[in-house]
UniProtKB/Swiss-Prot annotation:
GO terms for molecular function: ATP binding; CMP kinase activity; dCMP kinase activity. Coiled coil: none annotated. It comes from the Bacteria. ATP binds at residues 10-18. This is Cytidylate kinase. HAMAP family: Cytidyl_kinase_type1. One of its GO terms (biological process) is nucleobase-containing small molecule interconversion. The lineage of its organism: Bacteria, Pseudomonadati, Bacteroidota, Bacteroidia, Bacteroidales.
Amino acid sequence: MKKITIAIDGYSSCGKSTMAKDLAREIGYIYIDSGAMYRAVTLYSLQKGFFTERGIDTEALKTAMPDIHISFRLNPETQRPMTFLNDTNVEDAIRSMEVSSHVSPIAALGFVREALVKQQQEMGKAKGIVMDGRDIGTVVFPDAELKIFVTASAAIRAQRRYDELRSKGQEASYEKILENVEERDRIDQTREVSPLRQADDAILLDNSHMSIAEQKKWLTEKFQAAING
């Protein structure tokens, strides 16, 4: 069976990663979480004090980029990928609200996107991958055989994020999360470099009122159609 590239783009907290991980595991493809890569750079920037009262110290971050090494390893117990930053497991750390509230301005930096897009394209050369993010179908893999664009209402996405954080035992405020979701939408859609948009040949999925099982069935059907097409 031929292997293809699957690009899943969409808004923050709309379940892209869960969909992509489940699909990759089911069809035996490699899953690459592009959002985790931007979160890892954000975490590094927070740890190094690159966020100042005047904004991001872009020169310091640009100088540090060659020292930022991001990799993914499979958790043998959960069979889920874990994100490593310079050989340290940061899978939980990059999902914090602090990182969430700082990631969009980092992702809007041209030199950061350029460096990470190159890494992502290298990872996907052999096909047989599922990658989710904001610009996978438009910039990273414009020739992907299957492109999905996922959306859901901001209120529902905020509730999902709130539930996720609470399930991990983290303190969370629904109002602050909703504010963060709406702000990230604004930044993602209006940034100069690779703004969030639906590729012309992407299939739209509004999963506001769909269960995970319904999304999985829908996505599997689209994969089968792409393989047989």
